[in-house]
Amino acid sequence: VLPSAVFEDSPIFPCCERVFKSKTRVCFQEKINMHIRKNFRYPEIAQEMGIQGRVYVNFIISKDGSITNIRMRGPDKNLEKEAARIIGRLPNMTPGKQRGRPVRVPFSIPITFRLQ
């Protein structure tokens, strides 16, 4: 999970508010990865067609902490749709801040779809 820029205070995932400031980024990454694993469903049609690959998802954590502007790039529309569904289900966050003010923070994350 990569923020596209550097901010004084990165967004904070719910339940990461109580960790030390130096650990909030690690907590954020762990919680996002856990969210992806928990909500991941391989699209049936993609399984049947043997489609796999990596979908790159770009999104913004807005000034109010909501997830907006979800954009995907991947090998198949069904995989892209599932990646958007997973990211769209992320909870509202504590927004990132610059000079004490909430700011929009762009993120990029790859989601890998691999058949077993």
Predicted segments, located by residue:
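Charge-biased low-complexity segments
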Residues: 1-116
